[in-house]
């Protein structure tokens, strides 16, 4: 059997055996699948399209709507999630009607407590593909083994064991950036995520020591909420690079988010896409 990677197949490859198994139409599958399809279309055609009106207006005219930069990226979060997860809802719903079960591709990503956790919940099939065909091959390669040995000699055993994983994550998210598109903004988007994950890995022991010092177990409700909000902010910063036309525009809009804030400008955005530039 050919096990070469395919960017386009994703979860379908692992589930293709279901295509050759006998299935029969069942009322509960039809009902469940139809409900999932309707929910998907609602997210794509209502929520995503509604959010896109504000996203396009703000990102296409950042100086005209300078006080709305932060709203632009928040609406983009709604647009992305509703569009991507809505599409998967339709696919999963159709498959369900035929008795084929597909894995969920989004699992409450905005309740993540870290960037690593976010990527375990967001676009899961992409993350699985990257893990199987990029992360593991890189981590288990001979040159990475040599790099790990060098790291242990220079930085000690603990850091030396972590360095190969950090480097592998950087490579993975470089590929994630290129996967999104052949432009610098996508590479910066990918590396932004990779650097945060790599840095978190290097700092993991320090984080544990700090939590112990301040008597934080990690189970406190306030701490959990703090981690969710922190991660949500970090994720939204990355969206600036994903949606802006250039890296420069992304940084410009980040600056506007801090220096200017005028929610009243939302009233100036035309109600339809035809009114946006």
Locate each region found by the language model:
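Membrane-embedded transmembrane alpha-helical bundles that form the catalytic cores
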Residues: 1, 6-276
């Amino acid at each position: 059997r050919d096990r070469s990677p395919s960017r386009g197949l994703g979860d379908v490859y692992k589930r293709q055996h279901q295509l050759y198994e006998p299935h029969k139409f069942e009322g509960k599958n039809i009902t469940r699948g139809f409900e999932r399809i309707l929910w998907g279309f609602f997210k794509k055609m209502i929520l995503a399209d509604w959010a896109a009106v504000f996203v396009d207006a703000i990102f296409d005219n950042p100086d005209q709507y300078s006080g709305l930069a932060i709203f632009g990226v928040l609406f983009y979060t709604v647009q992305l999630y509703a569009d991507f997860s809505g599409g998967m809802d339709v696919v999963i719903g159709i498959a369900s009607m035929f008795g084929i079960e597909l894995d969920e591709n989004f699992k409450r990503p905005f309740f993540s407590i870290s960037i690593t956790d976010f990527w375990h919940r967001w676009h899961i099939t992409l993350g699985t593909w990257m893990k199987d065909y990029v992360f593991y091959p890189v981590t288990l390669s001979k040159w990475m083994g040599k790099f790990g040995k060098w790291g242990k000699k220079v930085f000690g055993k603990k850091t030396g064991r972590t360095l190969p994983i950090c480097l592998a994550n950087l490579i993975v998210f470089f590929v994630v950036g290129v996967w999104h598109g052949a432009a610098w903004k996508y590479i910066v988007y990918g590396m932004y995520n990779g650097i945060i994950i790599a840095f978190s890995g290097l700092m993991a022991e320090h984080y544990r020591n700090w939590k112990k010092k301040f008597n934080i177990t990690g189970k406190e409700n306030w701490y959990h909420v703090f981690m969710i909000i922190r991660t949500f902010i970090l994720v939204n910063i990355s969206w600036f690079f994903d949606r802006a036309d250039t890296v420069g525009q992304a940084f410009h809009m980040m600056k506007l988010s801090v220096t200017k804030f005028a929610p009243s400008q939302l009233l100036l955005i035309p109600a339809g896409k035809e009114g946006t530039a």
